[in-house]
Every structure is written in C-alpha cells, then in structure tokens.
C-alpha cells in the first residue's frame, strides 16, 4: 500500500538523531562563539545560545559539567566549548551538548579571580573595620613562606638588621602547586594555636598569576581573615596582588617591605629616646626657672609690704613651700631619671654587639672545625693514593719480570699458550734487563689441562 511509505514524525526524528550519533564528526565538536540567552533553572543545567555574526546554535550544559568549569558564564562572554551535536526529539531540533567550556581571549583564571574577589568583598572579608593594628614592639614574628626562596632570606635579613632581639619562627611551606593552599592554611592554623606570636608574615616572591594562585584560593583568604594573629600579606613584587592582600590586616609590596612593617628599627628608637631625653631636660629647666622667678617675686613682695612679724611668717611659709617645691622637683627628676635609666638599659640589652660577638665566635669555631676536617680528609686521600699505587705496582707486568718471569712474543704479538707456537717459529722472550731471541725446535703440550 502507498500509505506504508509514509513515516511518522517520531520515526523521521529518530532517524535524524541516529545520523548524528553515528557521524564521527558530530561526536566531538569544538565551537567558538558568544553566549546569549543564558538561563540556569533550579536544576543547575545551563541553557544558552552560542552565536557569531552569521549563525547561532542552541546549546545545553548539564549540571555535572557546569560544576567543573571554574567560572560563571555570562551573556556576551566569548567562549571556547567542546561537546557533541545531537537531536532534542521533543522539540524536533538539533542542539549542541556542551561538555567543557573556557573563556576565549581573557584567561579563565582572571575571570575566576575577579568573580571570587567580588563574592568575598560582598561578604565583608576585605572590610577595613575588621583589620587589626600591628604591634609596635613585637618579640616573636612568624613567617609562612618557602624555606628555599629569596623571600625568606629577605625577611630574615631585614628583621635581624632592624631589630636583632626579635625571634623569627619560619613555617616552611610550598607556595605553588595543588597542595600549596592547604599547606598555607594548615600553617596559619598552627600559628594561631600558639599564644606567643605577635605578628605573622605570609607571602612569596614574584611570579605569574598561576604561580601566585595559592594566595588567591578561597580557603587561604578566609584563613587570613579569621586569624587572631595580625597578618601581613606580601605576595610577589610591588605590581603583583593576591586576594590574601585584601583580607590581611596589612598588605606589603614585597617581603622586604613586610619585614620593615613588622618590626621597628632600633636606630630610630635610639633617636627617639635621645629626643625625649632632650625634651625632658628642657621642660625641667623651664619649670625650675619659673619656680625660681615666682620665688623671687614672693620675696620682693614680702620685703615691700609686710612688718617684721608678717615678714617672719611669710618667710616661714616661703621656706615651707620652697621645701615642698624642692621635694616635688626631686621626685620628678628621680622619676624621669628612673624612666630614662630603664629605657637606656633596654637599649643596651637589645644592642646588636652581643649578637655580633657571638656570631664571630661561631665563625671561628666553624673555621677551626673545617680546617681540621680538611686536613684529615687530605691525609686519608694521601694514604688511599699510596695504597692504590702499591696495588698497581704489584699488578704491573714489570713486577713479574723482577721476580724472574719472562714474557714471550711472536711477531710482536704476546704469546699466551703453547698451542700458539709451532716448530720452526722464531720468538722473542723479554726478561729483566733485556730480551733474547729463540728458535722453536721442539714443543711439548701439557695434556693435564693445567
């Protein structure tokens, strides 16, 4: 019947769907275009159109694939998508089933960074009101960075130069790679478990965005924000920045700058102490001069305005007040002198001369140990060399000649067995002191096998 040649809509749609499924060029398709009409319902799937100036392609990305892309797609964003072409039978249209997506042009990391920054800023992790004030005179500083990089050397050198008395505790950690963020968070937690750390420096030297990425990871940014110990973030060079810089209490342009922010310079303290001493002496001198002028005025008043009895009373009162003034002044001077002596003692205690002397002693001891080790090693090498020379001399063919043996040559070639010689051959035997030429007239082989 002619009606048998008519197909149902479902049948023809299934046929077209099968064609797409068996076509190898449709199984993995790479598409570049602009996202438009983006929708994401409660299911988590993405429905959108990929278009260029000539055409558009309906597309869908299921929730499992959406969770892996690492950024938030938006209308107008240019993307690179990998997936397959298939048929949505209910709507009777072909569409693109996206399996992987990444930004086209601007790197995915930059987009991910800006989106995470916006999210954390809305949560208040960068708020100035939350930031803690750095201590003026820390005694212990913790450093979270690589133990082999230039950053840790710069920090240690700067702190030792500025305030040798400060103890620096380094928490070595990897600063890039898959495990870097976890290690940084763990070390921040360890530091906060202690109760003797005054300030913490986290950071590393310069690098690319990928190399600095650990300090942009959300767990690191939150750990810095939640830290009870004040945090100085010093990631990269002056032009670099990381999200940990925004959540930290203070951001430093470089590791060296972080060390300068963490501790004061003892030389500045000496200058401030000298300035305060000068101001104290000046104030004391002015106070004394004012009191002396007041006393002189009082004496003149008594002389000009009172009889003898009144004068005596006034003189007694004057003596009384003069004594009180003297005592008060003495107490003030004693108090200021005590404060000055205490500050002066602290300055001498923290002076780097002691540390320098100790380091010189350590250098001398290490040099002596090194000299001793080098001499012993040289002696051992000489003895080993002598033993090797003796062994070589023992194995030398010349040593065999000295013991009475001879070496036989035939036509310049060394003869090792009697089987190599025939009657009538001419041979040369080398012995101690010379050689002899010989002619083979007979030979006898050893049949014992020795």
Swiss-Prot record:
Q: Which GO terms describe its cellular component?
A: cytoplasm; exodeoxyribonuclease VII complex
Read off the InterPro entries from this record.
Answer: Exonuc_VII_L, Exonuc_VII_lsu_C, OB-fold_nuc-bd_dom
- Give the source's domain of life in one word: Bacteria
Q: Give coiled-coil spans as residue ranges.
A: none
- Spell out the reaction equation it catalyses: Exonucleolytic cleavage in either 5'- to 3'- or 3'- to 5'-direction to yield nucleoside 5'-phosphates
- What is an example of a GO molecular function annotated in this UniProt entry? exodeoxyribonuclease VII activity
**Where located?**
Cytoplasm
| Any one GO BP annotation for this protein | DNA catabolic process
EC number(s) on record? 3.1.11.6
Q: Name one Pfam family in it.
A: tRNA_anti_2
Q: Which UniProt keywords apply?
A: Cytoplasm, Exonuclease, Hydrolase, Nuclease
Where is this protein primarily located? cytoplasm
Describe, as the record does, how this protein assembles with itself and its partners: Heterooligomer composed of large and small subunits.
**Family, similarity comment:** Belongs to the XseA family.
Q: What does this protein do?
A: Bidirectionally degrades single-stranded DNA into large acid-insoluble oligonucleotides, which are then degraded further into small acid-soluble oligonucleotides.
Q: What is this protein called?
A: Exodeoxyribonuclease 7 large subunit
Q: Which organism is it from?
A: Listeria innocua serovar 6a (strain ATCC BAA-680 / CLIP 11262)
Organism lineage string:
Bacteria, Bacillati, Bacillota, Bacilli, Bacillales
């Amino acid at each position: 019947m002619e009606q048998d040649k008519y197909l149902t809509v479902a049948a023809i749609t299934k046929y077209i769907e099968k064609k797409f499924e068996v076509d190898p060029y449709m199984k993995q398709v790479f598409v570049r275009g602009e996202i438009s009409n983006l929708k994401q319902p409660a299911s988590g799937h993405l429905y959108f159109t990929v278009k260029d100036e000539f055409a558009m392609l309906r597309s869908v990305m299921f929730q499992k694939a959406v969770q892996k892309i690492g950024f938030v797609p938006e209308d107008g964003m240019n993307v690179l998508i990998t997936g397959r072409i298939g048929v949505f039978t209910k709507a009777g249209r072909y569409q693109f089933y996206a399996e992987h997506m990444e930004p086209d042009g601007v790197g995915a990391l930059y987009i991910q960074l800006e989106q995470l920054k916006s999210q954390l800023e809305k949560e208040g992790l960068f708020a100035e009101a939350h930031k803690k004030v750095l201590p003026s005179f820390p005694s212990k500083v913790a450093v979270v960075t690589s133990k082999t990089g230039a950053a840790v050397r710069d920090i240690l050198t700067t702190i030792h130069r500025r305030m040798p008395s400060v103890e620096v505790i380094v928490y070595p950690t990897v600063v890039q790679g898959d495990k870097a963020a976890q290690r940084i968070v763990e070390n921040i937690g360890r530091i906060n478990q202690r109760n003797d750390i005054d300030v913490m420096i986290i950071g590393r030297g310069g690098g690319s965005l990928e190399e600095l990425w650990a300090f942009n990871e959300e767990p690191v940014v939150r750990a810095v924000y939640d830290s009870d110990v004040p945090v100085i973030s010093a990631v990269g060079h002056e032009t670099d920045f990381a999200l940990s810089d925004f959540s930290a209490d203070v951001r430093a342009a470089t590791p060296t700058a972080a060390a300068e922010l963490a501790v004061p310079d003892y030389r500045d303290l000496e200058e401030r102490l000298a300035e305060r001493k000068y101001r104290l002496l000046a104030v004391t001198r002015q106070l004394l001069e004012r009191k002396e002028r007041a006393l002189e005025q009082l004496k003149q008043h008594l002389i000009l305005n009172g009889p003898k009895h009144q004068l005596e009373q006034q003189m007694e009162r004057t003596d009384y007040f003069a004594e009180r003034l003297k005592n008060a002044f003495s107490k003030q001077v004693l108090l200021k002198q005590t404060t000055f002596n205490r500050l002066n003692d602290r300055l001498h205690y923290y002076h780097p001369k002691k540390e320098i002397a100790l380091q010189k002693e350590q250098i001398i001891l290490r040099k002596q140990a090194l000299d001793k080790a080098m001499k012993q090693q040289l002696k051992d090498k000489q003895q080993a060399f002598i033993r090797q020379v003796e062994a070589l001399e023992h194995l030398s063919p010349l040593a065999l000649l000295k013991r009475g043996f001879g070496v036989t040559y035939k036509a310049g070639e060394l003869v090792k067995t009697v089987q190599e010689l025939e009657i009538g051959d001419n041979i040369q035997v080398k012995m101690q002191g010379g050689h002899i030429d010989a002619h083979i007239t007979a030979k006898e082989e050893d049949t014992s096998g020795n």
